[in-house]
Amino acid sequence: MVIKKPANKVDKKSTFKSSNKKKNPFKSSFLTKNKDLIYRILFTLLALIIIRLGVYITVPGVTLDKRFATDSSRIQFFQLLSTLGGGSIGRFSILALGVSPYITASIIVQLLSTDVIPVLTRWSKSGERGRKKLDKLTKIIMIPFALMQAEATIFTLSSQGLIIPGWDNTNAIANSAFYYILIPLVMLGGSFFMLWIADQITIKGIGNGISIVIFIGIIISMPSNLKSTFEYWVSNSGEEANIFFSGLLNFMIYISVFLLVILSVVIMNEAERKIPIQQTGSGLTDSSEHTPYLPLKLNNAGVIPVIFASAIISTPITISQIIEAVNPDSGFVIFTRDYLSFNTWWGISIFGILIVLFTFLYSQVQINPEKIAENFQKSGTFIPGIKPGKDTTKYLTGIINRLSVVGSVFLAIIALLPYVISKLTQLPSNLAIGGTGLIICISVAIQTVQQLKGRIIQQNFIEKKKEKFTNNINKNKTSHIW
């Protein structure tokens, strides 16, 4: 009898707890469990809304010509700037430069950090503190590139009559200091603001901020590109039925190939080589399903080689745009037009070669075979049939190089596809299938989804740990209550 009384008390407590659970049905819901994740998603959406609002603020002191939106999209320099800048060049916005100058500066800093300048190499290996120093240096180097791109934009648009100095077609500020000095400074400020927003997304939001900013700019432009493609194939085909249906068929083929290209990019992004590994003393496993492995992606470098190649090839084109406004017959302008323009086979080929080179270089940066081999030795891990140490390094280097060959060629084909199609069919390159923008969009989308999944799994793991800990405490209380 003495023992039963405490048991009744326990039953009352458990009944009380269970009744509480019924009264609070949202206690274990997704929203309450993942408050941090929901906050990050909402913060990212808010940041992107702010950027999209900024796109509609035109640079002060100019009037846009009616032909601006259509004609500016056909200029190669603006196509590259639009891809890397977040797509706001089409409105000559204060955010027109986007994060393009920062990307160009970061390429230079990364290249100089690879044992070229000892101080930068030391910073790159000194953890978070060194990374912050490199980031500050990148932002300083970004300033001249941003001003140069802004000047090139103004010179190019002015020479073609796409922007008119002054408000309401008044020529009050033409050739003045405001036009050639203050407007570039406004665009520089816009670029820094966009970079700050991108940094905030990285810290408080979801995904890599710079990638997300570029991604949203490209995605926003896709519906208008599809509309323009429909008009190119169907609306402008004339009133004759056979020509109309022929144009409609061409558009349907275009959409089908577009979807196939998206599917192929997704497959190539997810494809990986699984290298079986063993732990010293663990013994052999019975089936291949339970064998631990080292995953090496077919495209280890991701979208970075395409972005880097675009930034590199856009730099001489930027300088050329400024020189052309002053001296159209300059040798440098002619060289750029003949050998770096995507309207020529030379320009297309050089762009492809740059993508291949950057894929090989960045694959070695992303996956360091020496570091992996060293970590394997420390943890007692080895690849069956391969000796630890130098042999493992050599083996991994060979596999990474072979994967890079396939990955780099694939990236180059997809990135060059719109320019090749444009060259062969006269379809405007900004409307053609594939391209840098498509690769960036798919890669960023996949990475962001993976990060979301990772955060959800991490949060669920923490919740289970908390629940297990609480249950253990309750059990201890119950066992000692009498």
Curated annotation (Swiss-Prot):
Main location: membrane
SUPFAM superfamilies named in the record: Preprotein translocase SecY subunit
Region (Disordered): 1-22
Membrane-spanning segments: 41-61, 92-112, 137-157, 177-197, 201-221, 243-263, 303-323, 342-362, 405-425, 426-446
Entries under InterPro entries matching the protein: SecY, SecY/SEC61-alpha, SecY_CS, SecY_dom_sf
Topology versus the membrane: Multi-pass membrane protein
Keywords (A to Z) from UniProt: Cell membrane, Membrane, Protein transport, Translocation, Transmembrane, Transmembrane helix, Transport
Cellular component aspect of the GO annotation: plasma membrane
One GO-annotated biological process of the protein: protein targeting
Localization per Swiss-Prot or TrEMBL: Cell membrane
UniProt family annotation: Belongs to the SecY/SEC61-alpha family.
Function: The central subunit of the protein translocation channel SecYEG. Consists of two halves formed by TMs 1-5 and 6-10. These two domains form a lateral gate at the front which open onto the bilayer between TMs 2 and 7, and are clamped together by SecE at the back. The channel is closed by both a pore ring composed of hydrophobic SecY resides and a short helix (helix 2A) on the extracellular side of the membrane which forms a plug. The plug probably moves laterally to allow the channel to open. The ring and the pore may move independently.
Subunit (UniProt): Component of the Sec protein translocase complex. Heterotrimer consisting of SecY, SecE and SecG subunits. The heterotrimers can form oligomers, although 1 heterotrimer is thought to be able to translocate proteins. Interacts with the ribosome. Interacts with SecDF, and other proteins may be involved. Interacts with SecA.
Protein name stated in the entry: Protein translocase subunit SecY
